[in-house]
Amino acid sequence: MAAPSGASPQSEYIQHHLVHLNNIGEKQSVIAQFNVINYDSLFWSILMGLLVVFCLWLAARRATAGVPGRFQGFIEMIVDMVDDQAKSIVTNAKSRLFVAPLALTVFLWIILMNALDLLPVDLLPSIWRMTGLGAEHGDPLYYHRILPTADLNVPMGMSLGVLLLMFYYGIKIKHPGGFVKELFTAPFHAHGLASLVLAPFNLLLNLIEYAAKSVSLGMRLFGNMFAGELIFMLIALLGGAWTGFNGASIGLGIGHVLAGSVWAIFHILIVLLQAFIFMMLTLVYIGQAHEGH
């Protein structure tokens, strides 16, 4: 989508890189536009999910009773870490049979999706231009974003899945009647007439709590990855300011390399940390669904 008339080249560059490959061929006009399908987010998220499945399958196939290799040892270390966290948070052993593998999958999946942000900003656009697939507006890959977790739909979709699991385990453990009763009687417990007076307030607080957990879980991941992606674009603009072998261009070029390297190293921590936080909160929220107020 072209930038508004009179916009600077820098603004046009950023606006172009923030538009998804979708079914309408341009940027969404509003945040919630349910007729829009972002093909790039679907492709890269599914591809990273399949890669997680393949890596876990490969580790299971190569598993031996003897001294594990580096790859097997690395996977076993991650599995043990996630399993330990699941045991300490979700006390129901039967629930952990599903929740622990889910947490492991979510953790690795988000790591791989986040790691796509470490690819050079203009790597794929350059490839699309050279192949003629994205040289100008109207080409099939003129718009293409590689980072699924910087698309609000992906983190919010995952957080919605966690919310549904909270409802599922809440109803399963407490039974439908107990779950509904808790919505109206907690966190302010009372008896008699007072319980009837407090029931609407309890329901409202519980609904707000569920909504806040779901929204904050998705927005935290989205916000951090979107900001990281935007910073990489701003750093890339330093390199794009090259005008020849002069003092200003050389200084900007050095700044581009240094800033890009420092931010990439720091961003590795963000990639891992955001995946860990999402996994831990998934376990915490599902664990809380097993407990009463």
From Swiss-Prot:
Key component of the proton channel; it plays a direct role in the translocation of protons across the membrane. The lineage of its organism: Bacteria, Pseudomonadati, Pseudomonadota, Betaproteobacteria, Burkholderiales. SUPFAM superfamilies: F1F0 ATP synthase subunit A. This is ATP synthase subunit a. GO terms for cellular component: plasma membrane; proton-transporting ATP synthase complex. GO terms for molecular function: proton-transporting ATP synthase activity, rotational mechanism. It is found in: Cell inner membrane. Keywords: ATP synthesis, Cell inner membrane, Cell membrane, CF(0), Hydrogen ion transport, Ion transport, Membrane, Transmembrane, Transmembrane helix, Transport. The chain crosses the membrane at residues 40-60, 97-117, 151-171, 188-208, 225-245, 264-284. Belongs to the ATPase A chain family. F-type ATPases have 2 components, CF(1) - the catalytic core - and CF(0) - the membrane proton channel. CF(1) has five subunits: alpha(3), beta(3), gamma(1), delta(1), epsilon(1). CF(0) has three main subunits: a(1), b(2) and c(9-12). The alpha and beta chains form an alternating ring which encloses part of the gamma chain. CF(1) is attached to CF(0) by a central stalk formed by the gamma and epsilon chains, while a peripheral stalk is formed by the delta and b chains.
